[in-house]
Design a protein with these regions (language model features):
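Short hydrophobic beta-strand element within catalytic cores of glycosyltransferases
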Residues: 298-301, 311
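Short alpha-helical donor nucleotide-sugar binding micro-motif in glycosyltransferases
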Residues: 96, 260-261, 268-273
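Aromatic "clamp/platform" in nucleotide-sugar-dependent glycosyltransferases that forms part
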Residues: 281
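Carbohydrate-associated surface elements
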Residues: 168, 188
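Conserved donor-binding/catalytic core segment of Leloir-type glycosyltransferases
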Residues: 7, 163, 198-216, 222-225, ...
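Nucleotide-activated donor-binding/catalytic signature segment of Leloir-type glycosyltransferases, i.e.
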Residues: 245-264
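N-terminal subdomain of nucleotide-sugar transferases
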Residues: 1-56, 226
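Membrane-proximal helix-turn-helix segments that form the acceptor-binding/catalytic region
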Residues: 143-162
Length: 321
């Protein structure tokens, strides 16, 4: 072979990369999106991406921007979790066998990638995302997420080299795999956020952006903003999730539910907000906090998560115990 082969097993935002997937895949995954573009100009490695998608019923292979994308069918997430991703793991392993990579780089523990990498006998590296075991310890979670946490613990123990986004995430991995060599490696922010100008709204306003479920502390946030003392502060909530309907019914007029919004709309709300609020009960390193900080927006958050490394309490925001 002329060049070493690198296989990267990760969720790709196919709708942002391929016009044929634009209406089928609306995920943003900004750190992977940025990495894909950063790798297009390198010539040292033959790069193969292995990614899962519900938008395909059979494997597809696409060559673009000096990289090869192997798109594999995802199928039912519930069935995958209950069967330890059996069929999906087989598909990934077959693809790895065809590629014969010199290095396997796995991203995340939520899908089948980390489990599929257990049997890989070459050099391998895991970039830890998810912290599912920690999430289950910190907030009520559905049965399937507890099952995912079980597969997380099983998979992580089989990796000797693991990168994490934050010291908080390193701590969570050490609880599962104390033998592993850990490196803290932050994920980047899309360049467009560095050039956003702040244009604060005339009246006080805050933004929350994320999944609407217990782990994000959204119940506490809504409870706080329904208090009369904050009736003059507008809270904009971007995102969807299991708690939205119940919490929206409890909301006062100063709480505005935006649902899912585009990247351009997110940037507009970040630009006009006085603060980003992120009351999480546990997060590896939320991208929204980094996006807020690179544009100079203060952040109010908790001490549970990797986001604390970007907030200096009392200077660039507040860290609530």
């Amino acid at each position: 072979r002329l060049r070493p082969v690198l296989a990267i097993a990760a969720d790709l935002p196919l709708g942002r990369l391929l016009t044929s997937f634009r209406n089928k895949d609306r995920r943003t995954i900004p750190w992977i999106f940025s990495l894909f573009h950063a790798l297009e100009s390198q010539e040292d490695f033959d790069i193969h991406w292995i990614t899962l998608s519900k938008a395909v019923s059979a494997p597809e292979t696409i060559r673009m921007r000096n990289q090869t994308i192997h798109i594999l069918p995802l199928g039912s997430m519930g069935r995958n979790i209950l069967t330890a991703h059996f069929l999906t793991v087989r598909r990934i392993r077959k693809t790895l066998n065809d590629i014969q990579p010199d290095l396997l780089h796995v991203w995340g523990v939520e899908q089948a990638y980390a489990l599929a990498g257990i049997a890989f006998r070459g050099k391998k590296l895991l970039s830890y995302q998810g912290a599912l075991t920690a999430y289950c310890q910190r907030a009520p979670q559905a049965f399937l997420l507890h099952m995912q946490a079980l597969w997380e613990r099983m998979a992580v123990k089989h990796y000797d080299l693991i990168t994490c986004e934050s010291p908080w995430a390193c701590g969570r991995v050490a609880e599962i795999a104390p033998h592993a060599r850990l490196s803290c490696m932050e994920y980047g922010v899309e360049p467009s956020f560095y050039h956003l100008a702040r244009k604060p709204s005339p009246e006080p306003s805050c933004l929350f952006a994320g999944t609407i479920y217990e782990l994000k502390g959204i119940s506490y946030l809504v409870e706080a903003f329904t208090h009369p003392s904050l009736s003059h502060v507008q809270l904009f909530i971007a995102g969807n999730g299991a708690l939205r309907e119940r919490l929206e019914a409890l909301s006062t007029p100063n709480i505005h539910w935006l649902g899912s919004i585009s990247r351009a709309e997110l940037q507009q709300h970040l630009s006009t907000a006085w603060f980003l609020v992120h009351p999480t009960l546990g997060d590896c390193c939320p991208n929204i906090v980094k996006e807020a900080r690179v544009m100079g927006l203060p952040v109010i958050t908790t001490e549970e998560g990797g986001q604390t490394q970007y907030v200096q309490d009392g200077v660039s925001g507040y860290i609530v115990p």
